[in-house]
Amino acid sequence: MFTEYTGNRQFDLQLNRTFAPILDRVGIDTIATATLPRVRSTQQITALAQNLAERFEKQGDADAAWRLYELAAFYLGADDPRKHRFIDAMSRTFDEAHRGLALTRHSVPYRGGELTAMRWEADPADQAQAPSGTPTTLVMMNGFDGYAEEIIDFASHFPARPFDIITFDGPGQGHTAAAGMPLEPEWEHPTEAVLDYFGVTSAAALGVSFGGYLVMRAAAYCPRITHVIAFDMMYRLLDGLTVPLPRALRPIADAVIENPRPARLIDAGLGMASRLSADLSWKLQQARHLTGLRRPSQVLRAFGDYTMEAFEGRITQPCLVLAGDADQY
C-alpha cells in the first residue's frame, strides 16, 4: 500500500520506502499520522530520519535503524560529510540486524577499484525441495539511488530461497559511487566481474527500478544470465526525467534532451527549474554524483547512452517484465 503522506510524490516515495517496514514500531504510527504530513522539505526529512535512526539504534532495534540512516543520507549531496557518516551507520546497523544469517560482504576487484557485493547463501532445505532446473544463483541489481543492503533485504520477502543471492553496487551505484567510480553504460562488464569473482557459470538476474534497464543490458551481452526479471523495465533512463512531467510538456522535454544545446541555455534553464522542484533538484544532484559530471547538459548527453534501442533483438533469455499502473519511473 502506498500512503500519500505529503502530497509530494518524490517525498512520499522515499517515506513509504523507509517507513512501510517499520510501521509496527512503538510511536511510528503517531509519526506517520501527525508528523509526516507536515513534511515540506528535504532538510526536514533528513533531520527526522537522523533523530529516529539514532533513537532506534540506542534501543537496539538495528533493523529499523539501518533503514532510517539510509533515508537520512538520501537527500544529502556527496560533499556533505553527514552523508558518509550516515551510510557507514547504515551498513553497521544492517550487519547487526542480519547477524547470524549466511550473508557475507565482498569487495570485487574492478578497473583499479572495487565493487561492493553481498552474497546470501541458499537455504539448504529450500534447495533440496526446489524443482529440477531451478537456477542456483540469483543476481539482483539495484537502480538509480539504491545500495546493496536495501536490494538484498528485498529478498527477505521471498517465500523460499533455493538459490544463492548475489547483489552488488556497480559503477555509479551506492558504495561504489561513493568511492568515486562513475556510472558506465556497458553493464555487462561489472556483471561479468561479479560472476567471475563468485565462480558463477549461470544465473538468473533481477533488476529493480533503473536496475530493470541494467539487467536487460547485462542479459543482452552476458550469456551466463539464463533468466531475466525486470521489476520494472525502463526502456531508457531519460524517461525518468520526462514521464513525471505533464503530458503536454513531454514532447518539448524530449526535444531538448535529444539535442542538449546550446549547453549554457540548458544549464541555466534546468538550474532555474530545479530551484522550483525538489524532485528535479534531487535528480540532478544524484545524476551528477553517479556520473561524475557537473553540468546538466553533460548529464543529459551521458544519460542518452542508457537506452534499449542499441541492443533490441539481442535478448533471447526468458524474461518476466513487471510494471505498475501508478509507477513514478
Regions found by a protein language model. Name each.
Residues 42, 49, 80, 84-130:
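N-terminal cap/lid segment of alpha/beta-hydrolase-fold proteins
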Residues 129-143:
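Short beta-strand element of the alpha/beta-hydrolase
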Residues 150, 157, 179-200, 204-205, ...:
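Alpha/beta-hydrolase active-site loop
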Residues 158-175:
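Conserved alpha/beta-hydrolase
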Residues 205-207, 212-223, 228-235:
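Short glycine-enriched nucleophile-adjacent loop
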Residues 229-256:
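Flexible "cap/lid" loop of the alpha/beta hydrolase fold
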Residues 293-311, 317:
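Active-site nucleophile elbow and catalytic-triad environment of alpha/beta-hydrolase enzymes
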Residues 315-316, 321-323, 327:
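Short beta-strand/loop motif that positions the catalytic acidic residue
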